[in-house]
Amino acid sequence: MSGQGNATITNTGEVHTGREQRTTTVTGVATGVSPNKTYQVVQKAKPEFVSFDDGAETSVAKTGGTLTITGKSNSTALTFELLDLTDDGETSGVVEGGLTLTLPEKYDAGGAQTTNGQPITGDPGASAEFTFSITFTNIPANTTINELTAALKVSTTGGQTAQISIKQSAGDPSFEFSEGTITLEASGAAVTNQIISNTAWTLS
């Protein structure tokens, strides 16, 4: 901008998501004035944070497989942990802590594979927030008729945390006999057959 005489300058900036403040210098050049005049503009940092993109809950298919959970942070390091859940039996059809997951040793932080709990290469969060993702593999299929749950917690270097519930849909009801035909002796002695089922049943 340019002008003449007295003026008021309005300073604005883009949203800053980095963990450290940033600065710039404004230089004024005026006719007949030497040296040039400057002032510094300081933009405050965003407090250290971490969040999951899906909020407080995400889901995995009843068939199992792979689940990737994403989020954002500006921390120097992130530490993930699976929480121990105890099923109190109060919610019918749900088994708290019944979903078996294996915590990966590494996750993706801003495109770089990073060891859980270790400093992130290049510290991208100093200048801007970054996207992270953690992928769970080989999740078993749900062979029960109950919803299964697990919980993942992530912590920043500064102690900020986020937690997300992971729910696996109930499996399909199943019922079958181990043998399609059994043979009783003439004496009528007992012969067994096995029922393989995950749901309530009756015989007639």
Where would I find each of the regions flagged by the language model?
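Residues on the solvent-exposed faces and adjacent turns
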Residues: A30, N138, T156, Q168, ...
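Solvent-exposed, low-complexity, repeat-rich "mucin-like" stalks and linkers
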Residues: M1, E48-L99, F177-S204
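Edge beta-strands of extracellular beta-sandwich domains
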Residues: P35-K44, T161-S169
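A short beta-strand micro-motif common to beta-rich folds, especially ectodomain repeats
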Residues: N11, G18-G32, F132-I134, N138, ...
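Extracellular interdomain linker/stem segments of modular secreted and single-pass surface proteins
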Residues: Q43-S51, Q168-E176
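Exposed beta-strand and adjacent loop surfaces of beta-rich binding modules
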Residues: T23, T38, A77-F80, T149, ...
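Surface-exposed coil/turn segments at beta-strand junctions on protein surfaces, enriched
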Residues: T17-R19, K62, G125-E129, T143-I145, ...
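Surface-exposed binding patches on compact interaction domains or structured appendages
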Residues: M1-T12, S75-S133, T199-S204
